[in-house]
Amino acid sequence: MGEHGKSMKTIKGPAIFLAQFVDKQAPFNSLDGMCKWAADLGYKGIQIPTWESFLIDLDKAAESQTYCDEFKGKINSYGLEITELSTHLQGQLVAVHPAYDLMFDSFAPDAYKKNPKARTQWAIETLKKAAKASKWLGLNAHATFSGALLWHTWHPWPQRPDGLVEMGFKELAKRWLPILNTFDENGVDVCYEIHPCLLYTSDAADDLLCVDLGGRRII
């Protein structure tokens, strides 16, 4: 059997990211409601946004195998599997340019708003918790955003000085290395979802491939 045939054998069915459907109205305001809704539509997997506390208690998930077993069991009871945990909002807060502080503050808990340094540290610690929770849940991949320090330079005037992009990616690597180390320790791959404000040209993608991330490959 060829590689294509082998990969087809591992496909279990469609999965869905719950974040886009969260609402104050049932069935989109509870874990049970969303699981039943997804299962009834024929989905086999769900990606769980960790910033929605009614879906998952990330603090407990990072510390308790019992909590994770019960959490996973509930989801499995609907014929669903967890594909990944998601920290898209928290990951974006790892690296926020000051020009966007006000807009991104809405992603953070009230205790960390209007305090960029504390907000960044909270985001980093949250990502580390997600790494541990992923391990307890038996997951080997995690979905997130990297943050974007250079979006304000997309079409600059005057032209950005030489070395600015490299400096931005170097700072991004500095902030992410401790997080990546934690995911490594827990046997979980980090999967960056690339939006236009993160890697906006092929040149920017090439620049990212040159970033020193402790010998890791960015695919």
Give the location of each predicted region:
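Hydrophobic alpha-helical segments, chiefly the membrane-spanning helices
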Residues: 211-219
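Glycine-/small-residue-rich active-site loops that bind phosphorylated ligands and cofactors
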Residues: 23, 197-198
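Active-site groove signature of glycoside hydrolases
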Residues: 134-155, 186-195
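Polysaccharide-binding and catalytic clefts of secreted carbohydrate-active enzymes
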Residues: 147, 151-171
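Short helix-to-loop capping/linker segments positioned immediately adjacent to catalytic or ligand/cofactor-binding
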Residues: 179-181, 195-197
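Conserved small/polar residues in nucleotide/adenosyl-binding loops
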Residues: 200-205
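N-terminal pre-domain/capping segments
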Residues: 1-141, 162-177, 184-187
